[in-house]
Amino acid sequence: MEHNPKSQLKLLVTHGKEQGYLTYAEVNDHLPEEIIDSEQIDDIIQMINDMGIQVVEEAPDADDLILNEINTDTDEDAVEAATQVLSSVESELGRTTDPVRMYMREMGTVELLTREGEIDIAKRIEEGINQVQSSVSEYPEAITYLLEQYDRIKTGQIRLSDIITGFVDPNAEEIFSHSTSAIHIGSEILDNITNDSNENEDENEDENEDEDENSIDPELANEKFRELRKQYTNTSNTIKNKNRNHQDSLLEIYNLSEIFKQFRLVPKQFDHLVNNMRNMMNRVRKQERKIMKLCIEECKIPKKIFLKIFSGKETDQNWFKKEQSSNQSWSKKLEEIKEKVFSSMKKLKQIEKETGLTIEQVKDINKRMSIGEAKAKRAKKEMVEANLRLVISIAKKYTNRGLQFLDLIQEGNIGLMKAVDKFEYRRGYKFSTYATWWIRQAITRSIADQARTIRIPVHMIETINKLNRISRQMLQEIGREPTPEELSEKMLIPEDKIRKVLKIAKEPISMETPIGDDDDSHLGDFIEDTTLELPLDSATSESLRSATHDVLSGLTAREAKVLRMRFGIDMNTDHTLEEVGKQFDVTRERIRQIEAKALRKLRHPSRSEVLRSFLDD
């Protein structure tokens, strides 16, 4: 018998069709070993029954078989039925509740990319981003905002790397020297990542952690911004003197777009410009929805008719007046909503005034921007899905460091997505070469942030790792553990900071850690509670108290009370001679005499011997 599960089940169904029945033993023998759940087995048996094949405990009589032969299906029906069962069983075999297996199976359905495939996807990402930037460049406020940000650099308020990460040369050809460029970029990224680990982990800085301000030529940036400002001025003047739809204006807008696309904006700045445009579009839609709701719901204008008369005339009141003068059923009701509709139109005109664009142009820009975003997003998704295996291979090396394997995969995926955003195919190296560093950095950063019970900043983790590395090196050189003084001299770090780092590097231990082979004792049971009195001190105090009571009982009641009050025995505090005198209604001198007499009695060897032993303690 074949061991293929499909062949076994097909043979089982065919056999059942021929003899008209199957026994539970036959079904059990032909089921794949992976199916052990009772519910899955019941579902398969039910499907076999639905095909007209009885599943019984034992083989039926010959008379029953003759009756069943009347309802036996054709061979084609048997094949079709077998196919249904096979597909069902395949789904059962594929079903799993293990998230790692589900992730691996789904990841395996995506084919690996070739070098040409990577370039193709990278070009699609670039095309999508260029389309977005081209659309945003037609929004005057976007150019104004970027130029204002550059002016802030001159005053020292921000850095150049806070605005742009570089420039794109549209005429640059792809570099095919894989060996040199790959080595160069690997060391470059490693240097950037190493430098980043010593910086503050502020979210805004983290967005630009790979950017080196020295890599942006200030003179080139100044030239590019001057060119952008000049073209923006020419475009504005042309649009002002001529219509925006004039051929000269369209040419100037195109030239402005081509210059603007050369700027590689920081993600934060790019998102700001896109969100500004999107917010403007949301304001337009809000007013349009108000007008549509008034006309359709309150005046009962059919939706198709409303869209026909309203589209392209959002700020034109003539369409509304024309509908008022028409003899339609809704004409009279329009008077009731006139003020509200005109108020919304006024707000739309205000948007046109702010942007210098018509509502139709705002919609067109937003549409092209959304298409570009979707194109880039789809391409990025393809690039990420095709490189998920790379994350798995790297994450395996960081297991047993405090994070679950799935958490490592997810953190690595975040690094992979960042690598997709920053990948430059024109440099000539493969994407995996570039992405490896980002994935590794994301995983190590997450381990530093989340693996410890008490979180330690990443820059301190780097210092600890460096200290451990030098400690191992010195251990091999001098044959013993180095002292903090020696580490301070070697690392050129103050000794007090070395001691602080060594203290921080200690791992916390749970108070519930079991001690010994038995589980009845824990670490917390062996830690001294400094807030409570030690058993020995408690026993000594109790013995002293008892001995003092016995000694005082040998004095008169008056003498004993005077000593108790003067020395605070069994009282909250001691008392002065005057306070004790008031208590007994005598002078201070008399109390002093009583006290002296009582102490002389206690110094007698018969009484003092009992208390003298406590002085030794």
Swiss-Prot record:
DNA-binding region: 577-596
Gene3D superfamilies: RNA Polymerase Primary Sigma Factor (1.10.601.10), Sigma-70 factor, region 1.1 (1.10.220.120), Winged helix-like DNA-binding domain superfamily/Winged helix DNA-binding domain (1.10.10.10)
Short sequence motif Interaction with polymerase core subunit RpoC: positions: 407-410
A single BP term in Gene Ontology: DNA-templated transcription initiation
Molecular function GO labels: DNA binding; sigma factor activity
Cross-referenced CDD domains: Sigma70_r4
Region ranges (Sigma-70 factor domain-2): 383-453
GO CC field: cytoplasm
InterPro entries reported for this sequence: RNA_pol_sigma-70_dom (IPR014284), RNA_pol_sigma70 (IPR000943), RNA_pol_sigma70_r1_2 (IPR009042), RNA_pol_sigma70_r2 (IPR007627), RNA_pol_sigma70_r3 (IPR007624), RNA_pol_sigma70_r4 (IPR007630), RNA_pol_sigma_70_non-ess (IPR007631), RNA_pol_sigma_70_r1_1 (IPR007127)
Acidic residues bias (residue ranges): 198-216
Keyword tRNA processing (UniProt): no
Main location class: cytoplasm
Sequence segments annotated as region (Sigma-70 factor domain-3): 462-538
PROSITE patterns on file: SIGMA70_1, SIGMA70_2
Keywords associated with the record: Cytoplasm, DNA-binding, Sigma factor, Transcription, Transcription regulation
Annotated function: Sigma factors are initiation factors that promote the attachment of RNA polymerase to specific initiation sites and are then released. This sigma factor is the primary sigma factor during exponential growth.
Assembly with partners or alone: Interacts transiently with the RNA polymerase catalytic core.
NCBIfam families given in the database record: PRK05658.1 (NF004208), RpoD_Cterm (TIGR02393), sigma70-ECF (TIGR02937)
The protein, known as: RNA polymerase sigma factor RpoD
Organism the protein comes from: Buchnera aphidicola subsp. Schizaphis graminum (strain Sg)
